[in-house]
Design a protein with these regions (language model features):
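Catalytic cores of nucleic-acid endonucleases
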Residues: 46-92
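Conserved functional hotspots at enzyme active or ligand-binding sites that engage polyanionic ligands
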Residues: 14, 18, 41, 59-73, ...
């Protein structure tokens, strides 16, 4: 289901002329970086889940290794937007990470109506311009010197 959500987002971003970059490793805090007009945005994508008839967006990562569970809450230092993908309705919730940081585990999608398919939030804004899409590697690694 996670891949379906990513594919849905990818289709919508490409229709809107975004460039999409994905990490080589799967276990990263960033699912993809998008670029348009020189503006880079880091995205985390989660599939909307239904529990007891209610749809919720999980806002943390739970991983386990050899019986040890780790819970990670995403921050604005790591990502710019959280994308909730409802694969039953093909709706995408475009949520700034500042909203996500206010919740511990999940958000009911009934409170997220403003963010439903609101792709305008991802469009480059005046004053929100980095040095360009060619600098994706530098943004990911912090390395301004290139590969050594």
């Amino acid at each position: 289901r996670g891949r379906l959500g990513y594919n849905l987002l990818e289709k919508e971003l490409l229709k809107r002329d975004f460039e999409i970059y994905v990490p080589l490793l799967e276990n990263t805090k960033i699912d993809c970086i998008i670029c348009k007009n020189g503006t880079l945005l880091k995205l985390q994508i989660k599939t909307i889940q239904t529990s007891r008839g209610h749809k919720n967006l999980p806002v943390r990562k739970i991983s386990h290794n050899q019986g040890e569970y780790k819970i990670h809450n995403y921050t604005s230092a790591e990502i710019d937007f959280f994308i909730g993908a409802d694969v039953e309705t093909d709706d995408l919730y475009i949520i700034p990470v500042s909203i996500i940081e206010q919740y511990k585990s999940a958000i009911s999608i009934t409170t997220l109506e403003f963010y439903k398919n609101n792709f305008a939030l991802l469009e480059p804004q005046v004053g929100n311009n980095l040095s360009g899409c060619d600098d994706v590697g530098e943004t990911l690694t912090g390395n301004t010197e290139g590969i050594e």
